[in-house]
A protein has these predicted regions:
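Conserved N-terminal structural module of periplasmic/extracytoplasmic solute-binding proteins
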Residues: 2-102, 106-107, 118-122, 333, ...
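Extracytoplasmic/periplasmic substrate-recognition and gating elements
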Residues: 59-60, 246-248, 289-357
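Short helix-initiation/N-cap motifs at beta->coil->alpha
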Residues: 70-79, 172-177, 253-265
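Hinge/lid segment of periplasmic solute-binding proteins
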Residues: 98-152
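Short, solvent-exposed loop/beta-turn-alpha elements that line the ligand-binding surface or hinge
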Residues: 114-127, 194, 211-235, 289-293, ...
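Extracytoplasmic/periplasmic solute-binding protein
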Residues: 140-146, 152, 176-229
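Glycine-centered hinge/linker elements that transmit conformational signals in sensory
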Residues: 179, 222-254
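C-terminal capping/gating helix-and-loop segments adjacent to ligand/active sites or protein-protein/ligand interfaces
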Residues: 318, 358-368, 379-434
Length: 436
């Protein structure tokens, strides 16, 4: 079954792996065996890859292995926050880096791994350089990048483009010029699951970067006063409203959810010409779209530049990686096991191959031959190229910001796309939660 972003990013109620053996398998020995503990996301196929890495490590370390526990849905965020705050966190903490990690790091709740990476420079050099940005807080590294990279991609329906007789956009001006062309044929220029909020956010992430460069959003992360009122930010906010006003999105987009994959269906059925979405969308199109992908109907590319913009067109946005941190409350022995797992158990050859077989691009460098031999070679190679060549890889804003600021962001993005607030009103609302 294809997974949506929220299936990938959402976690919740804990299910001990030992209790879930019949359903999804277990990797770890009991804690009485003297090992470390590890909480991570369940749901196949990702859970199977994670469990496989733990299994392999435990077979090599029968006396000091890792006990794993799996989770599902959004309640995990509350549970892990509570556990960390109470000093009862697992040894190894799975997460997304960014704003939440920043909170833990500044509170001294997770280990500083900077010196460990200095001592293991070969490991650091083996990973995509941009994957370390969401793992870094105040110049220090607090998490191990792991698993796969998920850039946001501009998808398009090749058949629809041929039908209308137009070419994929090479600039923002091209995007705006295509809007009336598709509307005249009764085809929505862009699909959008606007009810899900974060889908709208991807447009702003790219426009901020293409117009003003990564410095615009970085100023927000660094807590600069009134950073959202940067003139380039206002320009980006204005441009997205111009796209809405031009009927650039499917009618009724505010009532369409991404979790139902209704936005995906609009693209592969030809009711929409294009869609801005994460790399996980490819698997959904492949699974649900009949022969749409296999028949060569799906096109994909990086977001085009904005004429006169300051941003590097190689830059991308999305999820640079997933992340593993070590609880500062863990014992010395548990920390030792965790670091050994990072060095010898994470992103080893079998795990890398498993991610690729499941249609993902691992954050490990040097996988070109494996990607080229995969079932989805062209798409994975394009994604690897986008991720590895990106001058900057901006983390999804709702992960990069604190939970408080992220919720304010998502609420106001809905209003922005519904044209119920102006760019300056949006900026004012977000300025009020900078640093919170």
């Amino acid at each position: 079954m294809a997974l949506s972003r929220r299936s990938l990013l959402g976690l919740a109620a804990a299910v001990p792996a030992s209790a879930a053996l019949a359903a999804c398998g277990s990797s770890g020995p009991g804690k009485s065996g003297g090992g470390a503990t590890y909480w991570y996301l369940n749901g196949q196929p990702q859970e199977g890859v994670r469990a496989g890495a733990v299994d392999a490590y435990n077979k090599a370390h029968p006396d000091d292995g890792i006990e794993d526990t799996t989770f599902q849905n959004d309640a995990y965020k509350t549970k892990i926050k509570t556990a960390i705050g109470a000093g009862q966190a697992p040894t190894i903490i799975w997460g997304w880096g960014g704003g939440t990690l920043r909170t833990y790091a500044r509170a001294g709740q997770v280990e500083d791994l900077t010196s460990w990476f200095d001592e293991h420079s070969d490991i650091k050099k083996s990973l995509l350089a941009t994957s370390f940005d969401p793992a870094t807080v105040d110049g220090k590294i607090y998490a191990m990048p792991c698993e796969n990279v998920q850039p946001v991609v501009l998808y398009y329906n090749k058949k629809v483009f041929d039908q209308v007789g137009v070419e994929p956009p090479e600039s923002w001006d091209d995007i705006m010029a295509l809007v009336p062309e598709f509307n005249a044929k009764g085809i929505a220029p862009f699909s959008l699951g606007g009810q899900s909020r974060w889908t709208n956010m991807m447009w702003l992430e790219f426009l901020f970067d293409r117009i003003g460069g990564p410095e615009v959003f970085q100023a927000v992360i660094e807590g600069e006063k009134n950073a959202w009122s940067n003139p380039d930010a206002i320009t980006a906010l204005t441009k997205v409203q111009e796209l809405v006003e031009a009927d650039g999105f499917i009618k009724g987009f505010s009532s369409i959810t991404a979790d139902s994959n209704a936005d995906q269906a609009l693209l592969y059925t030809g009711k929409a010409a294009m869609m801005l979405h994460g790399s996980w969308s490819y698997g959904i199109q492949q699974a649900d779209g009949g022969d749409f992908v296999a028949g060569g109907g799906l096109g994909y590319m990086n977001f085009p530049p904005v004429d006169g913009g300051k941003g590097d067109p190689s830059n991308t946005v999305g999820n640079p990686a997933q992340y593993l941190s070590i609880s500062s409350k863990a014992t010395a022995e548990e920390k030792k096991i965790a670091k050994d797992f990072f060095a010898t158990g994470v992103l080893q050859d079998a795990e890398v191959k498993a991610w690729i077989d499941n249609g993902s691009v691992p954050v490990r460098l040097g996988t070109e031959k494996l990607l080229a031999a995969s079932k989805s070679a062209d798409f994975l190679e394009v994604n690897y190229g986008i991720a590895s060549k990106a001058g900057t890889f901006v983390q999804s804003w709702d992960q990069a910001l604190s939970p408080t600021a992220a919720e304010t962001l998502l609420d106001n993005i809905v209003k922005l796309f519904q044209l119920s607030i102006s760019p300056k009103q949006f900026a004012g609302a977000l300025n009020a939660v900078i640093g919170k």
